[in-house]
Amino acid sequence: MEKIPSFQLDHIRLKRGIYVSRKDYIGGEVVTTFDIRMKEPNREPVLGAPELHTIEHLAATYLRNHPLYKDRIVFWGPMGCLTGNYFLMRGDYVSKDILPLMQETFRFIRDFEGEVPGTEPRDCGNCLLHNLPMAKYEAEKYLREVLDVATEENLNYPD
């Protein structure tokens, strides 16, 4: 079997950032898949499943309610490797286009207070697997160290 494109990416050189993972054409429209990479693969500890799950709930809720983008949001979900998230949007985008949106999203997570949306047993398949304090910590770290100081190497995959 052929290696799929995401397994051909040089994870040894990959930094934290926002990357265009792929673009698909569905019904005449482009769907852009972003790699929202919060941890350097194989070089730093991965995100814990509880905080990543909380980030998923908060980011998905925020984005699907965003006044400008809610109709363009397709999906937000965690990577199996626990180093970040995949984010799919209708439209032909580059990473720089969504940097302000990601800054807003991670500020929302960092500043969130109260009950995390969708964490009741009827709403979630694993409602006990959440950690809001750590989600807020990871959101702040990603904002401060990556999103608020992003350079080209945080926005384009290494060659």
UniProtKB/Swiss-Prot annotation:
Q: Is Iron one of the keywords?
A: yes
Q: Which InterPro entries match?
A: LuxS_sf, Metalloenz_LuxS/M16, S-ribosylhomocysteinase
What processes in GO biological process is this protein linked to? quorum sensing
Fetch the Gene3D superfamilies from UniProt.
S-ribosylhomocysteinase (LuxS)
Quick one: signal sequence residues? none
Catalytic reactions of this protein:
S-(5-deoxy-D-ribos-5-yl)-L-homocysteine = (S)-4,5-dihydroxypentane-2,3-dione + L-homocysteine
In short, the EC number is: 4.4.1.21
Tell me which UniProt keywords the record has, alphabetically.
Autoinducer synthesis, Iron, Lyase, Metal-binding, Quorum sensing
An example of a GO molecular function for this protein is: iron ion binding
User: What does the record's cofactor remark say about binding?
Assistant: Binds 1 Fe cation per subunit.
Q: Which Pfam families match?
A: LuxS
Q: What class of enzyme is it?
A: lyase
Q: Which cofactor does it need?
A: Fe cation
> Where Fe cation is bound, by residue?
H53, H57, C124
Question: Is Metal-binding found in the keyword set?
Answer: yes
What is known about what this protein does? Involved in the synthesis of autoinducer 2 (AI-2) which is secreted by bacteria and is used to communicate both the cell density and the metabolic potential of the environment. The regulation of gene expression in response to changes in cell density is called quorum sensing. Catalyzes the transformation of S-ribosylhomocysteine (RHC) to homocysteine (HC) and 4,5-dihydroxy-2,3-pentadione (DPD).
Q: Which family does the record assign?
A: Belongs to the LuxS family.
Assembly notes: Homodimer.
Matches recorded under HAMAP family: LuxS (MF_00091)
Which protein, by its recorded name, is this? S-ribosylhomocysteine lyase
In its UniProt entry, the species of origin is given as Porphyromonas gingivalis (strain ATCC BAA-308 / W83)
